[in-house]
């Protein structure tokens, strides 16, 4: 497989099954534009999408209940979907399957750290030189629940860092713990968060990251955190 030229420079949403996938619905309802939407596994049964990433073999869903609640949804998708569904093995029971270009991706990106399906999707975006990647429903951990976490967060954040290093714009759903996005602004920089006047990170007018003491921009932060209320007259 060769890189898909039409993806170069485009804006792509990757939507997983974590809690912050609701932010995707909110973004769509507010007119946020995506050139393509890539669904992770059974999310494809719920939202419109252009591509599915399912790195498990289809037999996991057809021949076992190992996927739990995803099993029936994935069976339905696999039986009827035209594709592309990127996976590790073709199966005659699912006509939409396409082999993931793992040889090309590993060779061209010189990296084999791929321990979950989302990481494969991000690597595919990097390989295809996507311009902007927006992450929804990719959370792994949840604030307030110290006893639950899914494996794979480190791998996903590693690939997002590689994307940023290559010049790709990366955005994460506001409610997601990925890249510490949902952490309060004054808690993002470890150590400084313990100070009476903590350091905070903001974007300047050129959209570059700047670091200030909270006291320097207190009013601006508070104003941005206030909800915007609209009445029936849009005022």
Which positions does each model-derived feature cover?
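Metal-ion/cofactor- or nucleotide/acyl-coenzyme-handling active-site neighborhoods
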Residues: 1-235
């Amino acid at each position: 497989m060769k890189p898909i030229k039409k993806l170069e420079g485009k804006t792509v949403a990757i939507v997983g099954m974590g809690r912050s996938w609701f932010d995707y619905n909110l973004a769509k309802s507010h007119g946020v534009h995506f050139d393509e939407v890539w669904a992770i596994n059974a999310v494809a049964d719920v939202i419109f999408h252009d591509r599915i990433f399912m790195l498990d073999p289809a037999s996991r869903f057809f021949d076992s209940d190992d996927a739990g609640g995803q099993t029936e949804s994935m069976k339905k998708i696999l039986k009827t979907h035209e594709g592309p569904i990127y996976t590790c093995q073709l199966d005659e029971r699912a006509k939409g399957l396409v082999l993931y270009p793992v040889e090309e991706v590993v060779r061209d990106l010189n990296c084999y750290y791929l321990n979950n399906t989302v990481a494969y999707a991000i690597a595919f975006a990097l390989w295809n030189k996507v311009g902007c990647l927006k992450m929804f429903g990719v959370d792994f951990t949840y604030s307030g629940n110290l006893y639950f976490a899914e494996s794979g967060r480190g791998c996903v954040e590693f690939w997002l860092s590689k994307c940023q290093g290559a010049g790709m714009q990366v955005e994460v759903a506001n409610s997601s713990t990925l890249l510490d996005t949902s952490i309060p602004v004054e808690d993002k920089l470890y150590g400084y968060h313990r100070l009476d006047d903590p350091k905070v990170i903001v974007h300047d007018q050129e959209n570059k990251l700047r670091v200030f003491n909270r006291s320097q921009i207190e009013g601006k932060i508070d104003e941005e955190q206030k909800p915007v209320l609209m009445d029936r007259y849009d005022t």
